[in-house]
Amino acid sequence: MEQPVIKEGTLALIDTFAYLFRSYYMSAKNKPLTNDKGFPTGLLTGLVGMVKKFYKDRKNMPFIVFALESQTKTKRAEKLGEYKQNRKDAPKEMLLQIPIALEWLQKMGFTCVEVGGFEADDVIASLATLSPYKTRIYSKDKDFNQLLSDKIALFDGKTEFLAKDCVEKYGILPSQFTDYQGIVGDSSDNYKGVKGIGSKNAKELLQRLGSLEKIYENLDLAKNLLSPKMYQALIQDKGSAFLSKELATLERGCIKEFDFLSCAFPSENPLLKIKDELKEYGFISTLRDLENSPFIVENVPILNSTPILDNTPALDNAPKKSRMIVLESAEPLSMFLEKLENPNARVFMRLVLDKDKKILALAFLLQDQGYFLPLEEALFSPFSLEFLQNAFSQMLQHACIIGHDLKPLLSFLKAKYQVPLENIRIQDTQILAFLKNPEKVGFDEVLKEYLKEDLIPHEKIKDFKTKSKAEKSELLSMELNALKRLCEYFEKGGLEEDLLTLARDIETPFVKVLMGMEFQGFKIDAPYFKRLEQEFKNELNVLERQILDLIGVDFNLNSPKQLGEVLYDKLGLPKNKSHSTDEKNLLKILDKHPSIPLILEYRELNKLFNTYTTPLLRLKDKDDKIHTTFIQTGTATGRLSSHSPNLQNIPVRSPKGLLIRKGFIASSKEYCLLGVDYSQIELRLLAHFSQDKDLMEAFLKGRDIHLETSKALFGEDLAKEKRSIAKSINFGLVYGMGSKKLSETLSIPLSEAKSYIEAYFKRFPSIKDYLNGMREEILKTSKAFTLLGRYRVFDFTGVNDYVKGNYLREGVNAIFQGSASDLLKLGMLKVSERFKNNPSVRLLLQVHDELIFEIEEKNAPELQQEIQRILNDEVYPLRVPLETSAFIAKRWNELKG
């Protein structure tokens, strides 16, 4: 079939499942995405995002094909039974979405191609070979290197990989790539190649001898290029090498002919064709974007389409550049420092990182002049360490430093150059963005949302590190000017005045508190953790053997799929709808088989082992301290989060979890730990906001609030017996809990839960009036406000009653959780200010409503009393008193009475 020649645009070949799987696992890093009905949507979200991106770039891909995997056994799997068998089983949550995703692709009008017995890679190879057009393969699979030519390129979504790039990266031609794979193997596909020969020696062999066949034809020459051990492996693994090459070789003839005109990119937005499905699965924001779109392209030839511009923003947001000076001598840097004598100087600054977060440089902008300081080279020449220490100190002393996520930059300057941070002036646009909408804080997404600019930050550019200084400078110039415009946007009306004040008085000073905690670190008992690591490992082995013996078959205990098959199919235990083996479902069949309690015990221990015991030993510094990273803008409610490691999620209620906490200790014998915990902070906020007389009186007189509630609901005689129910109701209300959730929490009938809540509101009508009023206010304003005026935004446009109910519950929760966060921040600021430059008190950690300090043991009672006084009396004038409990100990696990 004769094909037309297209002079512009390309044929896009999509490695469909690879794209979707990657987006699914990215979305599942923190918490898997689900819709309001609990159905998993991470993979579908990736599909929708992919289609949005492709539609935006449709003029560059007039023809598009989605390549699919064969549903039958592939040729490679027939050749090698172990082929890809080392890969983990796909999560059931993901598998549920695949048929839906394929159906959506078909409905949207895309061409999907599957060939029985062949992988999607083979489909792509065949179509790329047949194609008369320039062809772009959308994938990160390195096997496609063998196809690269002047007509075929590989694209990972950001960077194009050409034939010359294959030569540069691997030192071989694309035509030699299967030979290369034959030698080095591929661990992801589970074929081994030649054991012990890596990329360096494989490259030398192929550069010298040309192909795998030539290598084995000229073993005497190959012998001179290898160590004796490698040469012996080459001889022994000949069969493996040729099998590996065969497996790596993509089939270019599984499709003999193809009508490329039939795979034109759909002329209208493909998502319009699945509006009903998007609604069904809860893609509300996508539907809203479709409805609010100022234009819909219909029946427009893609190759001749003209870009349609958005409305011009209020600010002048056209991308601007500044002249950049690469600082390679002391003179221009000294001249820059002289300009800082202006007391109103503002320096816009970006920490320059590579994709692995390694620091490469600093870029900064003063007025309209940009500067690029390569730090890797600058450490040696022409700048001395002392010169840079002085330069950075002057910079932070004289100018207001403005950045987006400044804490890593400031921490770097303090750690590397000992720059004092006590009296610095800063403005962080990430904090301003967080106050405007806590759901969107990333630099690129904030620029897109508020300035309507598409800018890829340098750290997301794959080859940024290898670019020339001139290229880096130009990219950073764009970033710095975008940062400047973003700051102007927030300061000139983009953010309410009271939130700017909140940023200045609370959130910005809080950055310094967090840096102090991070630098201080929390010491661990390293020998204890080494012993615990071995104990956990031994116990895991024993548990695993016990479980397998009880079940009577060997299988991978860490595979939910295999566990489900064993429990539900082999043992015939009662099944749930999804065959899930999560904790909730295993608890339902706890008494059905003696292995179930052991499986739950194994899982808890395995999580502790992999999350804490081993990682903590790896992450400790030379002083055996753990330095976590606190995220100020990571949660919608304003609560702190931490990572690397997450010290806020160390279990407290289980004996094994307490063993982890036991390993955290005071840094020396002169110090001890102090834990100060706010008592019932959300309920005190409920009393403050609702002004309920009975609730306020109970707190003012120091009564047991849960017992008082129980008396009001059940009478004096049953009060103690029913206290736990009253406690669940008290806390449930501030978390937006309804009768259904209460019935699940207490394991009681729904009707009984409803009667408890009705009785509660009848007894405390002012609380009911307050909560109803808050819901009405959230519906009216689409915002839920905290004590200090932060807010969370909810968009009720076009949502159904179910979603609206969820939003209102989240809104009520945001008021109390967010206000509790406000109080904790105020308390941490007050204590930090009181003990500034005083080594007798060091703030280490915040966990929920608790603060962990390290204090001098000789003055421990007095210091405890002073810290509690500040936290109780100086934080905020609520209508009821704030109250804390405190404990002193040498180890973290002992901080509860």
UniProtKB/Swiss-Prot annotation:
- Reaction equations catalysed: DNA(n) + a 2'-deoxyribonucleoside 5'-triphosphate = DNA(n+1) + diphosphate
EC code(s) of this entry: 2.7.7.7
The answer, when asked if Ubl conjugation is one of the entry's keywords, is: no
Cited CDD domains: DNA_pol_A_pol_I_C, H3TH_53EXO, PIN_53EXO
Instruction: Return the SMART domains for the record.
Output: 35EXOc, 53EXOc, HhH2, POLAc
Q: Which residues form a coiled coil?
A: none
Q: Which residues form the 3'-5' exonuclease domain?
A: 318-494
| Annotated 5'-3' exonuclease domain residues | 1-317
- Which keywords does this chain's UniProt record carry? DNA damage, DNA repair, DNA replication, DNA-binding, DNA-directed DNA polymerase, Exonuclease, Hydrolase, Nuclease, Nucleotidyltransferase, Transferase
Biological process GO terms, please?
Answer: DNA-templated DNA replication; double-strand break repair
Q: Give a yes or no for keyword Flavoprotein in this entry.
A: no
Which InterPro entries does its entry note? 3'-5'_exonuclease_dom, 5-3_exonucl_a-hlix_arch_N, 5-3_exonuclease, 5-3_exonuclease_C_sf, DNA-dir_DNA_pol_A_CS, DNA-dir_DNA_pol_A_palm_dom, DNA/RNA_pol_sf, DNA_polI_H3TH
Tell me the GO molecular function terms.
Answer: 3'-5' exonuclease activity; 5'-3' exonuclease activity; DNA binding; DNA-directed DNA polymerase activity
According to the record, the residues making up region (Polymerase) are: 498-896
Its family remark reads: Belongs to the DNA polymerase type-A family.
Q: What does this protein do?
A: In addition to polymerase activity, this DNA polymerase exhibits 3'-5' and 5'-3' exonuclease activity.
Q: How does it assemble?
A: Single-chain monomer with multiple functions.
Name this polypeptide is given = DNA polymerase I
Please report the organism this UniProt entry assigns to the protein.
Helicobacter pylori (strain J99 / ATCC 700824) (Campylobacter pylori J99)
Query: Encoded by which gene?
Result: polA
